[in-house]
Amino acid sequence: EFDLEEGILDAARLTQVVVDPMNPLAYKQEKETKFRDTVVTLLIDSSGSMRGRSITIAAMCADIMGRTLERCSVRVEILGFTTRAWRGGESREAWINDNKPSNPGRLNDVRHIVYKSADDSWSRSRRNLGLMMREELLKENIDGEALIWAHNRVVTRPEQRKVMMVISDGLPVDNSTLLVNPSNFLEQHLKYAISMIEDHSPVELVAIGIGHDVTHHYKRAVTITDAE
């Protein structure tokens, strides 16, 4: 509680007193707030387009959220997603060896990363965030499958409230897949995954778009036009 006549001096309001000594000192009272038993999953796009400032900002957000929420006794899971190769991997080779049948679906191998599991302490897992910025890790992004994977991890947890936050800078892109499937193949699967979670799951889904308007896909979303 703020703007009280007695209690703990509110240091954040001291500048107002310095500027105008006629302003009264402000006091506050701290109260314990009971958080609902909560777990938060942070799912980070680890594709090549995130290279540089964007992935640095994502890592900083993960660091701040992880430390802050752990102090509030909220469990945090930090995940990432990309592909194992550029322009196809073993999936594409298997398709070629099978005489390239039509409508093959995904033709790259997904890479899903656990930087911090919900049950790990922050002190043990924090250094893993540095791996997020390794150049050789950041390749292509197949978002729909990553959402389903992250959702399936969190939905079975015992906490009462489950929140999943996605940080991404664009639509799913995998050149090998899109060359031989409809151009909206990966986007349509992403929409399906979002709809499944938003309409049929107890998990609360939110998204942050970095330089990309994700409000077209997610019901609860914000867009950051510049990673700065």
What does each of the following model-derived ranges do?
Residues 1-228:
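Acidic, glycine-rich A-domain
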